């Protein structure tokens, strides 16, 4: 269930707080293969299941770290809805990203979003989110990112 805000300035009251935890989302092998094609990153650890079963320490194919990272936008739509006062939101960048553990094909991930900071910039509010992508069945996150989003008002 998303956190629903009537206006973007209501984010000010949430700085320093965990905002939401998304539902689990499957990372199917087919999605990994499609991402490999789109990005032209066809390294065998992502697309060759037989070789990965034989040679990889993970025992199967794994998702690209950038695939996991690219899903933050999808998860944010599930996590937070701002009903009014936003013309558009823009992915402004990342301050820091790490991939502490691998996402095996056919596993599930979800995201915890914490609002680290919020500041006024010309025509927008700039939010920095701590995004911790969790892997079902693991205590260790598979991605940790400081994500900068601008909400143009």
Task: Describe the role of every protein-language-model region.
Residues 2-63:
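Catalytic strand-loop segment that frames the active site of acyl-thioester-processing enzymes
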Residues 20, 24-26, 98, 148-150:
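Generic structural detector for well-ordered beta-strands
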Residues 1-14, 99-153:
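HotDog/MaoC-like acyl-thioester-processing domains
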Residues 17, 21-23, 31, 41-43, ...:
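A generic structural signal for short beta-strands and their flanking turns/coil linkers
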Residues 59-60, 73-112:
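Hydrophobic beta-strand-centered segment that forms part of the acyl-chain substrate-binding groove
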Residues 21, 70, 111-113:
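A generic structural signal for residues embedded in beta-strands
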């Amino acid at each position: 269930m998303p956190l629903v805000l009537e206006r973007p300035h209501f984010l000010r009251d949430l700085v320093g707080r965990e905002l939401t935890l998304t539902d689990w989302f499957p990372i199917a092998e087919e999605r990994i293969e499609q991402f490999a094609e789109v990005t032209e990153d066809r390294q065998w650890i992502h697309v060759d299941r037989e070789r990965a079963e034989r040679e990889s320490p993970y025992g199967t194919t794994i998702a690209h770290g950038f695939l996991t990272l690219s899903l933050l936008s999808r998860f944010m739509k599930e996590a937070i809805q701002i009903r009014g006062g936003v013309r558009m939101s823009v992915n402004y960048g990342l301050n820091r990203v790490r991939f502490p553990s691998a996402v095996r094909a056919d596993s599930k991930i979800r995201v915890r979003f914490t609002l680290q900071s919020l500041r006024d910039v010309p025509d927008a509010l700039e939010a920095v989110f701590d995004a911790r992508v969790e892997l079902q069945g693991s205590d260790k996150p598979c991605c940790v990112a400081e994500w900068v989003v601008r909400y143009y008002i």
